[in-house]
Amino acid sequence: MKNACPRLVIAGTNSGVGKTSLAVGLARGLARRGLRVQTFKVGPDFLDPTYLTLASGRTCYNLDGWMTSRGYIEQLFARATADADIALVEGAMGMFDGASPQTLEGSTAEIALWLDAPVFLIVDAHGAARSLAATVQGFSQFEAGINVAGVIANRGGSERHHAWLSESLSAAATAPLVGMLPGGSLPTLPSRHLGLITADEAILPTAVLDQLADVCERHVDVLKIVELASRQRVAGGQWPVAGESQISDLKSEISDLKSQISNLKSQITSPQPLAPSPSSNPSKIRLGIARDAAFHFYYPDNLESLERAGAKLVPFSPISDTRLPADLDGLYFGGGYPEMYAARLADNVAMLDDVRRFADSGRAIYAECGGLMYLGRSLTALDGASHSLAGVLPIETTMLEKLRSLSYAEVELTENSLWGPRGATLRGHEFHYSELTNHLPIDSGWQEVYNVRRRFGDRNKSEGFQKGRILASYIHLHFASHPEAVEHFLSH
């Protein structure tokens, strides 16, 4: 059974080539003209999806082939695109970069292959002419089954440069040029850590989103891209040579475009969207979710899986709320940037006291990365200032100038825990600029219940700090990596 929604993948030859700007611009341009654009981001990154969510007006989902599975990704894609007109997937790093130096595992190419999606490859054209065709040909032929349908040249030059690149690609009988962005035409998006700064911090205005969309419409044949994305669902990958049409006004064509997409979707039988899982909890479990400027790194499908399993998610702000919501059964602190708001978090003594009381009550608390830092005794910022925090865990953290850890991680539970019995395995991602500056006291009652096997960096380590029904770790878990994990968590 094939999913009918037209789809496309925006990939790059490497990081920093303009994938996010192009993806956001295309998503915004299509959405503001009435198309329901469902966006996705390849890999574990929490940051770029915030921009894609703002651009499309719909929640962006991560597609990670290492943390989850092909079957899960196909089902998630089907569910998310059930009412969409088109799906846009932003890749990560270079198209073939992922969790392995030898295979497609965890790469953008793997997702394109699984979704049977045409790839539009972004290439840096600065200082390149016919050599760009060699690059594209290499990417097109490197792995079987990957369909590079079009090329978008970034940092291009004159009209003559455009013509030269187009002729070079045509002569090489490879994917056609569907756009060239002149150097400096895209607004610069500031960066922080891995990817972009958060949308909440940037308060990315509509004017900037529209500027990105305007640049894409001016220099990229958006209609050709949509046509190719739609045609793939019927033709099974036969790509016509694109012309060099320029978009001057999409408003008069958008109704026809939506009609074409609707007709194409009707030709293919779509799988039924995933039905909610029957809950084993007749009365809703009330799970408090820390959600504010300091805590916002959550995989949307993780939260949805909790809801399908019977949880009522109740948001609260550790920055501005003075008390936890009433009648909670558990707390979930995700990651984010607590170091940026450490003073405000420390000044909110009423909330810190309430979190400590909650921990003393024996109810469940789960914390990841920034949440781990918040539950600790103190956080020392880059300026040397130390901020007292919840003190639920007898740990202290310190911010570093350089990246401390960046890696996929497989977790084996060495003891029964909130996420499963001893011996269960889950997968996740670790990314942080802080480190623990003390060890757990031997007589504290805390255990390290994770045996962590990392893909990169230090290979193995013990982590996952647990005491009673409190569990905290630097690792962001993807719950789909262990299907029984959510039910086990809610039952505890």
Where are these regions (language model features)?
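Intrinsic disorder/low-complexity segments
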Residues: M1, V234-P282
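Phosphate-binding active sites in nucleotide-utilizing proteins
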Residues: S283-V349, D353-D360
